[in-house]
UniProtKB/Swiss-Prot annotation:
Name the UniProt record assigns to this protein: Enoyl-CoA delta isomerase 2
Alphabetical list of PROSITE patterns matching this protein: ACB_1, ACB_2
Motif (Microbody targeting signal): 389-391
Enzyme Commission (EC) number: 5.3.3.8
UniProt-listed InterPro entries: Acyl-CoA-binding_prot_CS (IPR022408), Acyl-CoA-binding_protein (IPR000582), Acyl-CoA-binding_sf (IPR035984), ClpP/crotonase-like_dom_sf (IPR029045), ECH/Chromodomain_protein (IPR051053), Enoyl-CoA_hydra/iso (IPR001753), Enoyl-CoA_hydra_C (IPR014748), FERM/acyl-CoA-bd_prot_sf (IPR014352)
Taxonomic lineage of the native organism: Eukaryota, Metazoa, Chordata, Craniata, Vertebrata
Biological role stated in the UniProt entry: Able to isomerize both 3-cis and 3-trans double bonds into the 2-trans form in a range of enoyl-CoA species. Has a preference for 3-trans substrates.
Post-translational modification: Acetylation of Lys-60 is observed in liver mitochondria from fasted mice but not from fed mice.
Tissue expression: Expressed in liver and kidney (at protein level).
Organism: Mus musculus (Mouse)
Gene3D superfamilies named in the record: 1.20.80.10, 2-enoyl-CoA Hydratase, Chain A, domain 1, Lyase 2-enoyl-coa Hydratase, Chain A, domain 2
Residues annotated to bind substrate: 196-200
Phosphoserine PTM sites in chain numbering: 99, 117
Gene Ontology process terms (BP): fatty acid beta-oxidation; fatty acid catabolic process
Residues under site feature: Important for catalytic activity: 277
Length: 391
């Protein structure tokens, strides 16, 4: 999450540096992470047997792959024949985890089983809907009309920079849209910006130890990105203005990206001593080639809308004067298409790389957790903030 906004520069002193270390470590604040021990893992194995609802074949394959990775490490079996469908599916799921460490696979297995257990014990739909609606933030607007769930970044005075609560609200909005009668979900921004990424001014209330904060942040980031990987319906970005940081890297997980000709795309990770997230270390080279991906992810090159289109990050660019009218007219037409056909087609397009995306996301979050605790990251962000750059 490389994007930062800051209200004003201040004098730096040792006490401020200590606060800043904590702020960087808490770039994402979430629920306390479980440090999955062998006992936690064994408990999760027993818990799977007690699930009241069948989680479905896709989740079963994910559980199988994580179990094998956690107990045996990277896939070491010969690839089954094409007609051995069951074992081929298992092999693909395990092999997609690549070199994911055993400890991370064990943690992911425990987290997945925990989420399955929680969902099986969830309250009735009516009560849950009322409770979840009350948790929505004014900074994320969620509306549904004409079969479209519109999710809007709504902090125009902060250039739509994302707060901790906004991350949680987006996870919730996607969860709800995945199971209701929505045909597609569309993201956009209020005001001049689409989204300026993460807002460091929200970290001043951070408490607790640095390592714990970084660990919690990695959990929230992983869950946030997984909510995009898991979304089963068409996912569209309507990029009305400049986009920075995670609002850019997430675009590789969208099914369509429509941009105004005044939009720009910027990922200043190295400038902040950080590393890519939202699976961009995988999706960007796949979309635009290694050299162009490196320009963005390593060297922080800012792309215009036309450049982003030429490199495959953007589906189509529209003149600012007609952007809203043209895009929303088209989306309303798309929303009238048979929803199950679109959902099934998306599943066919995405399913073969889904486990790969989970693995990449987990590895990126582990790497970022370490980066947030590094001196290089602390110093880079301090330098960035003190210069008050224009996004």
């Amino acid at each position: 999450m490389a994007a930062v906004t800051w209200s004003r520069a201040r004098c730096w002193c040792p006490s401020v540096l200590q606060v800043f270390r904590l702020q960087v470590a808490k770039l994402h604040l979430g629920r306390p992470t479980m440090r999955a021990s062998q006992q936690d893992f064994e408990n999760a194995l027993n818990q799977v047997k007690l699930l009241k609802k069948d989680p479905g074949n896709e989740v079963k394959l994910r559980l199988y792959a994580l179990y094998k990775q956690a107990t045996e490490g990277p896939c070491n079996m010969p690839k089954p024949g094409m007609l051995d469908f069951v074992n081929k599916a298992k092999w693909d799921a395990w092999n997609a985890l690549g070199s994911l460490p055993k400890e991370t696979a064990r943690q992911n297995y425990v987290d997945l089983v925990s989420s399955l257990s929680s969902s099986s014990e969830a309250p009735s739909q009516g009560k849950r809907g009322a409770d979840e609606k009350a948790r929505e933030s004014k900074d994320i607007l969620v509306t549904s009309e004409d079969g479209i769930t519109k999710i809007t970044f709504n902090r125009p005075t902060k250039k739509n920079a994302i707060s901790f609560q906004m991350y949680r609200d987006i996870i919730l909005a996607l969860k709800n849209a995945s199971t209701d009668n929505t045909v597609m979900a569309v993201f956009t921004g209020t005001g001049d910006y689409y989204c300026s990424g993460n807002d460091l001014t929200n970290f001043t209330s951070a408490t607790g130890g640095i390592e714990e904060a970084a660990s919690n942040g990695a959990v929230l980031l992983r869950d946030f990105v997984n909510s995009f990987i898991d979304f089963p319906k068409p996912l569209v970005a309507v990029v009305n203005g400049p986009a920075v940081g995670i609002s850019v890297t997430l675009l590789g997980l969208f099914d369509a990206v429509f941009a105004s000709d005044r939009a720009t795309f910027h990922t200043p990770f190295s400038q902040l001593g950080q590393s890519p997230e939202a699976c961009s270390s995988y999706t960007f080279p796949k979309m635009m080639g290694s050299a162009k991906a490196a320009e963005m992810l390593l060297f922080g090159k800012k792309l215009t809308a036309r450049e982003a289109w030429a490199q495959g990050l953007v589906t189509e660019v529209f003149p600012e004067s007609t952007f809203e009218t043209e895009v929303w007219t088209r989306l309303k037409t798309y929303a009238k298409l048979p929803p199950n056909a679109m959902r099934i087609s998306k599943e066919l397009i995405r399913k073969n790389e889904k486990e790969k995306l989970y693995a990449v996301n987990a590895e990126e979050c582990t790497t970022l957790q370490a980066r947030w605790l590094s001196e290089e990251c602390m110093n880079a962000i301090m330098s960035f903030v003190s210069r008050k750059p224009k996004l």
